[in-house]
Amino acid sequence: IGYQTVIYKDITLQLGEVYNLNVEMSESSELLNEVIVTAAKTKFTAEKTGATTNISSAQMTQLPTVNRSISDIARLSPYANGMSFAGGDGRSTNFTIDGANFNNNFGLSSNLPGGGNPISMDAIEEVQVVVAPFDVRQTNFIGGGINAITKSGTNTFRGTAYTYYRNQDMRGNRINGEDLGARSDESKTTYGFTLGGPIIKNKLFFFVNYEKEKTPGEVIKYRAREDGEDAKGMVSRTLKSDMEKVYNHLKDKYGYDAGSYTNFPADEENTKLLARIDWNITDRHRLSLRYNNTKNTAWNAPNGNSSDTGYRLNNTYRVGTQSMAFANSMYSMDNKVQSWAADLNSRFTDKIS
């Protein structure tokens, strides 16, 4: 003897919201072979311990974001301004992934590790922004904290493939009727995929995300001047003929190719990889393993401290109206971050876990 099926629709709960649903069921004479109960538990605690903003993956999909970054999503909190909260220093903000700290330990800027966004937005299930919480479990920061929960596999195989493209034609050049002039060339291409599913149904699951960003650019926009040409704008007083002489001297005497002095390609690349395994060991023990790898490559012009012009070139490094450099004098800065995290949840009794 069982009960007839009762279906309630159009009930939507926000993270942390408590809702009581009173259900009246009628008896049925049918014999039930089995009862299957499925539920999706909230990733964060339902008890608020301060000003909290929770953002689901569905909301993140609908939100406009230019940079596809955590700071874009955190703007849903009225306290947020980039990685700064309530007017505080962004370096004091704490960022966690699946409960593990993921901060910029170097401490010179509020940028996250990896030279950009260390985790793809398509790998995030939920984001929580907290400001001055009084929960003693949330520590190591002053002011604001961002907690991100990554996606995990389910009993159904699911995958996505995506690409995003942006260039200067997608950016306006007029504000309040004022023409800002010609837009400089720029482009950014992002592509990636996600895949998740069961290894053993109801027991072992996997989730993988890969994403790559490419941003073509030029670090040096100055050019050497022709004979008789004025050195103004983006034209250096260094003569093109002098650059040619130096190039030929290095090539003939030392066999060294100094590179171009008219073209300075400096493409920036960012690669992200995330892999996660979830294991339901028993009804009382669950284990999660996550691996995250981020690599960012950015090119820089020669350092301004090595200039022989008698003063430091803060804005243009060693290239500007007074001097020029060759392409092979540039250097790349590779920012690599690897992170491992393991989370074991065990419930020994109804009161001890």
Mark where each language-model region is.
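Extracytoplasmic loops and strand-loop junctions of Gram-negative outer membrane beta-barrel proteins
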Residues: 55-56, 108-111, 128-130, 175-179, ...
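Transmembrane beta-barrel domains of outer membrane proteins
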Residues: 86, 130, 147-149, 196-198, ...
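Outer-membrane beta-barrel channels and translocator barrels
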Residues: 151-153, 200-202, 282-284, 349
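Periplasmic N-terminal accessory/gating domains of Gram-negative outer-membrane beta-barrel systems
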Residues: 4-24, 31-152, 177-179, 192-194, ...
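Transmembrane beta-barrel strands of outer-membrane/channel proteins
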Residues: 39, 161-167, 208-212, 289-293
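Outer-membrane beta-barrel domain signature, strongest for Gram-negative TonB-dependent receptors
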Residues: 213-353
